[in-house]
Curated annotation (Swiss-Prot):
Pfam families: Ubie_methyltran. The keyword Ribosomal protein does not apply. The keyword S-adenosyl-L-methionine applies. This is Ubiquinone/menaquinone biosynthesis C-methyltransferase UbiE. It comes from Xylella fastidiosa (strain Temecula1 / ATCC 700964). InterPro entries: SAM-dependent_MTases_sf (IPR029063), UbiE/COQ5_MeTrFase (IPR004033), UbiE/COQ5_MeTrFase_CS (IPR023576). Belongs to the class I-like SAM-binding methyltransferase superfamily. MenG/UbiE family. One of its GO terms (biological process) is aerobic respiration. Its EC number is 2.1.1.163, 2.1.1.201. Keywords: Menaquinone biosynthesis, Methyltransferase, S-adenosyl-L-methionine, Transferase, Ubiquinone biosynthesis. It catalyses: a 2-demethylmenaquinol + S-adenosyl-L-methionine = a menaquinol + S-adenosyl-L-homocysteine + H(+); a 2-methoxy-6-(all-trans-polyprenyl)benzene-1,4-diol + S-adenosyl-L-methionine = a 5-methoxy-2-methyl-3-(all-trans-polyprenyl)benzene-1,4-diol + S-adenosyl-L-homocysteine + H(+). Gene3D superfamilies: Vaccinia Virus protein VP39.
Amino acid sequence: MSESSEKTSTTHFGFRQVAAKDKKTLVAEVFTSVSRRYDLMNDLMSLGIHRAWKRYFVATAQVKSGDRVLDLAGGTGDIAMLLKNRVGAEGSIVLGDINASMLSVGRDRLIDRGVVARLDYVQCNAEALPFQDKCFDLVTMSFGLRNVTDKDAALREMFRVLKVGGQARVLEFSAVTAEWFKPIYDFHSFQVLPRLGRLFARDAASYRYLAESIRKHPPQEELQAMMGSAGFERCGYRNLTGGIVAIHSGYKY
């Protein structure tokens, strides 16, 4: 079932129920708050492992030199930088993010590192992408889908803009599979992480939301089914680090 406001009047913002029309604003406030410390946030949430996850996410993507790639929820540009190495000088990347602060951080970082050619920045909502049909060889989203109000709409849009034969990939925090690890993970998420957020970023509330948003995100099998419903074929996922994150893939034929 779609999470759109047309079908339900409320949705979740972490563990809170809020008006669906308000979620984008609330999420925007979180990411505006953490944008300058976004890598710190990911380091705290993953104990630094997110860098290895992202490298593997890009290394195993179906992408080649000369391809055109859309990286949604592109944040501070780390996925785009890794992708640029895959598509080469003839390839192009569009870094899309709904949050202007995140987009600005990503642009500044990539310019500072000399990554400027054939790289565009677009502020856009994943639920209604401003691109033509069938115009990207690969569409990626890393640690962004759980913050989208209408995930079904975002997946349909990813499918729409993907070329026939192309691949969509989602890297997202998921459902831990090891029973023994769940209480440890919960303690880190709900007791340690907000305190670290208060200590290092002076923002415990945003970090608490981010931990809660992981628990409200669809588990692996459910997200796989959602991708199938959006039109993707050969949908599958690979758990990393005991299911703390999962990489979901789907193809358009």
